[in-house]
């Protein structure tokens, strides 16, 4: 783990951890997120996106057939279901001393969701994901001054 070495070398516990999938995120987003982080002082700020499809209707495959994961929610109208949010897999701001006590950063008690524009999000697991990322990158570049 490089974090302890970074902290010792720079005498700083404040970390911006950006993942390779954050390639589309412009500097102004980091600046705005950091201001929120400093003002609100959560244990961690996570770049977050709203999940567009109700997770409550999610299914899993068992013996070649779909089965609802949340059986009690399948007949609930989507307008009555709570919205769900996900780590966008882009970046985190945190204080290493505060977060080190957790097995996972997602176990922290004070997680601030920094809502991110979907223009900046991407999943990168397949070649088609990469092609879509390149498309989004070119689109964003063409719109920038």
Regions found by a protein language model. Give the residues of each.
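Short acidic donor-binding loop at the edge of a beta-strand
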Residues: 7-16
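Hydrophobic helical membrane-anchoring modules
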Residues: 114-115, 119-145
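Active-site acidic Asp-centered loop
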Residues: 18-20
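A polyampholytic, Gly/Pro-enriched intrinsically disordered region
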Residues: 1-8, 64-70
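Alpha-helical elements of Rossmann-like donor-binding domains used by nucleotide-donor carbohydrate transfer enzymes
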Residues: 1-5, 29-36, 132
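Short, surface-exposed amphipathic charged segments that create phosphate/polyanion-binding patches used
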Residues: 1, 59-63, 127-131
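Conserved core of the sugar-phosphate nucleotidyltransferase
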Residues: 14, 23-115
